């Protein structure tokens, strides 16, 4: 199911359960300040789940993924909550609860599954823009391409992506490879002629920042 990127987080949590809080940050998120300051800004906030654009069904009934949530019991649409999760924080006890619920058969897009299950289970769910602070707005943090212009200090920006042509020409072949630190995939594209394949990588170890 699309929106299942909470599973790598849960795997890490189960292998490393000693933290109080776990932050997830997509690789196209940028903060115009010190990341340490961002974490400190949220340090005094005890919410089990912190994210952005936290909305209930009444506020945004046309959101696409409300119906993806399913499990052992029915949570009415009016009781469901969604968030926007390019950057979010979960407490250790919240992750333990989510893991338990998934083990019972719950599933859904993580932007509805996480906030809904947690609020329904009595955990605290809060917006990053709470307590009078402003860490994002619609001009800095969105699912749409951002307008160009001067960046505001101390704000979360998303998406930070390079623009690509609207009709990207695909090669005849697609090579999908699971790669790690000692991968030889760089050699595959060397040669005098342009290779007739697109290369897509699945990184299976901790070498994310040095794999290309």
Where is each model-derived feature located?
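Short, surface-exposed basic-aromatic patches at helix termini and helix-loop junctions that form
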Residues: 14-17, 36-45, 119-123
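Active-site-proximal specificity loops/subdomain of glycosyltransferases
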Residues: 1-17
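Short, amphipathic alpha-helical segments
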Residues: 3-6, 29-33
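Short, hydrophobic/aromatic alpha-helical segments in well-folded domains
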Residues: 8-11, 24-25, 34-38, 113-114
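Short beta-strand-to-loop acidic/aromatic patch adjacent to the donor-nucleotide binding site
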Residues: 19-28
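C-terminal catalytic/acceptor-binding lobe
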Residues: 99-210
């Amino acid at each position: 199911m699309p929106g299942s990127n909470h599973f790598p987080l849960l795997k890490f949590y189960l292998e490393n359960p000693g933290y109080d809080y776990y932050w997830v940050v997509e690789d196209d998120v940028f903060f115009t300040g010190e990341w340490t300051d961002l974490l400190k800004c949220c340090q005094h906030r005890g919410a089990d789940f912190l994210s952005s654009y936290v909305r209930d069904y009444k506020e945004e009934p046309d959101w696409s993924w409300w119906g993806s949530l399913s499990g052992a019991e029915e949570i009415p649409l009016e009781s469901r909550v969604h968030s926007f999760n390019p950057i979010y924080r979960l407490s250790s006890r919240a992750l333990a609860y989510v893991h338990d619920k998934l083990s019972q058969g719950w599933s859904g897009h993580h932007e509805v599954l996480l906030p809904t299950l947690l609020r329904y289970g009595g955990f605290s769910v809060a917006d990053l823009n709470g307590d009078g602070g402003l860490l994002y707005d619609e001009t800095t943090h969105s699912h749409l391409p951002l307008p160009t212009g001067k960046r505001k200090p101390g704000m979360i920006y998303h998406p930070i992506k390079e623009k690509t042509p609207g009709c990207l020409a695909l090669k005849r072949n697609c090579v999908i490879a699971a790669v790690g630190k000692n991968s030889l995939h760089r050699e595959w594209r060397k040669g005098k002629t342009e290779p007739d394949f697109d290369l897509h990588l699945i990184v299976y170890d901790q070498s994310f920042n040095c794999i290309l």
